[in-house]
Amino acid sequence: MGKTLFQKIWDAHTVGILPDGRTQMFIATHLLHEVTSPQAFGMVRDLGLTVRHPERTFATVDHIIPTDNQAEPFADATADAMIRELRRNCAENGIRFFDLPTGLQGIVHMVGPELGITQPGMTIVCGDSHTATHGAFGAIAMGIGTTQVRDVLATQTLALSPLKVRRINVNGKLAPGVRAKDVALHIIGLLGAKGGLGFAYEYGGEVIDAMSMDERMTLCNMSIEGAARCGYVNPDRTTVEYIKGRLFAPTGADWDKAVERWLGFASDADAEYDEIVEIDGASIEPTLTWGISPDQNTGISGSTPNPSDAADDDERKMINEALEYMKFPADMPLKGLPVQVCFVGSCTNGRISDFREVAALIKGRHVAPGIRALAVPGSQMTARQCEEEGIADIFREAGFEWRLAGCSMCLAMNPDKLQGDQLCASSSNRNFKGRQGSPTGRTLLMSPAMVAAAALTGKVSDAREVFSLN
């Protein structure tokens, strides 16, 4: 009987089985940022312990970083204290910290892949919800809480419960103008915001095989929005070529050995899955959210739902709550809905390929009057690449605010925030109430191409029509 990638990695990292049935797992790589690590370091210190494997631990700063002016001290005293605390903790424990002056700082889920830290076959954890991003490389990557961050710092292990594995096959071919973000939102809408509870998602099929690593990262990044503990893609030659030559990638004879080992983690042809879901890629259209959860979404040709069509009282209640918060009527077409803010960035869609695509679409055009448009690269490496390729200038000339690297408007932990009831077309990952900084601000999740279309027209628009992508 063959094994899935999940089973292979789980078995390879099992230290032992605990009396309660959980598995004590060795953690290959631990990623840190400034928000969830201070308390964990404090607990380790209070216990009289030290960091067990600093060489397997990497840190960066991303959530609280201002993206307009990163001169220190920061205007926000709390943010300034947080970065200083992370510096202290990393220095005291010998942890590699990709700080602002290094030129390698960025969102943690971009820094790991860009530097070659993220590799197939690893167990990877971080005190951040979107750690599943690293699963794009054929790793088992999970977000953890602060007490678990403490445990990994002190022991390099973690007590975890086994997961079921759901294989999600997306076959056929995507229509022109349909992107990885649309696939991710479609899957979440199909399976639900709680559909992945207790599961690891294995993404496969012709559409996934054809995706670039950036696209696979977008897909895996959104796994948690469907409640999956992790999501991954089997490693292949696309994976290998992405890692090759990066700062932490193996070299020489070690490279050849690593590649052979990495590819061996891919699920066997006769592996058995707990569930298999089949999706026709051709059926997916540009997709966007209409409510306050990522599963509340529809294709660009769709409308807000009618509560009277709900399957049960619970669903009816959720629809009513979402429509009330979003200030939308039932049965309202989303196409043509005016927006006030547009955001390209985040660990979901803040990569070089995202900015290349949008730059090609907006070149020679301009943001619609009255629209605030932000472009925020997810890392300093990506920002430099955009400057070198002339991409940043295209955004500036089109009327976008070109920002420094950080999480920015994805969440309300830095100065980039919505005001009042503003409606934002966003390439980020969550549309929860108040997520983007204003307690009444509203978010429409969509692909970068769709954000670009909204920025140029001032309203929700079909990117295929605006940019003649058909």
UniProtKB/Swiss-Prot annotation:
Keywords for the protein's UniProt record, in alphabetical order: 4Fe-4S, Amino-acid biosynthesis, Branched-chain amino acid biosynthesis, Iron, Iron-sulfur, Leucine biosynthesis, Lyase, Metal-binding
Transmembrane feature ranges: none
Annotated cofactor note: Binds 1 [4Fe-4S] cluster per subunit.
Function field: Catalyzes the isomerization between 2-isopropylmalate and 3-isopropylmalate, via the formation of 2-isopropylmaleate.
Name of the molecule in the record: 3-isopropylmalate dehydratase large subunit
Cofactor(s) demanded: [4Fe-4S] cluster
E.C. designation(s): 4.2.1.33
Keyword Amino-acid biosynthesis belongs to the record: yes
GO annotation terms (biological process): L-leucine biosynthetic process
Pathway: Amino-acid biosynthesis; L-leucine biosynthesis; L-leucine from 3-methyl-2-oxobutanoate: step 2/4
